[in-house]
């Protein structure tokens, strides 16, 4: 599944190649998507390449080849459609400053410890940031003894960057929805209103560090304007 921003970039590249015969420059792509820097374009192109939609050709300027096109990329009018940044459920908005729509509440709890249902909202990366699916796919039952107050949701982990924190590929992480966290907390972090990742939060002066629990992955240090907290890890479910 591609993010809206990935789709928009693929659409723009396809139309520019159809009109001029050559791919757009990184500056043109940055301006078309209203991004602040070309690093965002690099990340989008890498994601599209990993998913098999684009191929970069070595030793050639503007060497981007479109390999395949999903139906969603080709609008009936052929026009390039702009969009506002979209993010993971728990932070998806029509504009970055707007608040997220409420998530489904946990259901069925009582004072006798009856299990409650937590919505599974998609996948989260414990590795290179990936897009998370924004719709509820199923629910998982949990004992209320493992949950504090507030709204909770679950995400399926993809990747191995948090293995030294005991979080493995395929685990379900249970997240308490909140937009703040303490240094040292493991959080769902949204980067550039586009990509979601599960990392340990560290504060370094005015910057935010997203720290992996696997020495094979580098810590990412970002400005506070580029990171939004979508929730804090409170529990983990693993099937054997």
Curated annotation (Swiss-Prot):
Belongs to the peptidase S24 family. It comes from Methylobacterium nodulans (strain LMG 21967 / CNCM I-2342 / ORS 2060). This is LexA repressor. GO terms for molecular function: DNA binding; serine-type endopeptidase activity. Residues 26-46 bind DNA. Its EC number is 3.4.21.88. InterPro entries: LexA, LexA-like, LexA/Signal_pep-like_sf, LexA_DNA-bd_dom, LexA_repressor, Peptidase_S24_LexA, Peptidase_S24_S26A/B/C, WH-like_DNA-bd_sf. The record marks 126-127 as: Cleavage. GO terms for biological process: DNA repair; DNA replication; negative regulation of DNA-templated transcription; proteolysis; SOS response. Represses a number of genes involved in the response to DNA damage (SOS response), including recA and lexA. In the presence of single-stranded DNA, RecA interacts with LexA causing an autocatalytic cleavage which disrupts the DNA-binding part of LexA, leading to derepression of the SOS regulon and eventually DNA repair. The gene is lexA. Homodimer. The active site is at residues 161, 199. SUPFAM superfamilies: LexA/Signal peptidase (SSF51306), Winged helix' DNA-binding domain (SSF46785). Keywords: Autocatalytic cleavage, DNA damage, DNA repair, DNA replication, DNA-binding, Hydrolase, Repressor, SOS response, Transcription, Transcription regulation. The keyword DNA-binding applies. It comes from the Bacteria. It catalyses: Hydrolysis of Ala-|-Gly bond in repressor LexA.
């Amino acid at each position: 599944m591609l993010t809206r921003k990935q789709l928009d970039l693929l659409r723009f590249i396809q139309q520019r190649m159809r009109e001029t015969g050559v791919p757009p420059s990184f500056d043109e792509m940055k301006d078309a998507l209203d991004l602040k820097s070309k690093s965002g374009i690099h990340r989008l192109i890498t994601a599209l390449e990993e998913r098999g939609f684009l191929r970069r050709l070595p030793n050639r300027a503007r060497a981007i080849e479109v390999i395949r096109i999903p139906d969603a990329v080709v609008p009936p009018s052929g026009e390039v459609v702009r969009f506002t940044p979209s993010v993971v459920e728990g932070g998806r908005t029509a504009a970055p400053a707007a608040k997220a729509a409420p998530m489904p509440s946990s259901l069925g709890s009582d004072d006798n410890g009856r299990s409650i249902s937590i919505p599974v909202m998609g996948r989260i990366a414990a590795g290179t940031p990936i897009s998370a699916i924004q719709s509820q796919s199923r629910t998982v039952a949990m004992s209320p003894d493992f949950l504090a107050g507030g709204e909770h949701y679950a995400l399926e982990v993809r990747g191995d960057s948090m293995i030294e924190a005991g979080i493995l590929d395929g685990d379900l992480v249970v997240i308490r929805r909140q937009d703040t966290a303490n240094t040292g907390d493991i959080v769902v972090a949204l980067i550039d209103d586009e990509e979601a990742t599960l990392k340990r939060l560290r504060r370094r002066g005015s910057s935010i560090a997203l720290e992996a629990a696997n020495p094979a992955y580098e810590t990412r240090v970002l400005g506070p304007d580029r990171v939004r907290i979508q929730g804090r890890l409170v529990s983990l479910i693993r099937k054997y």
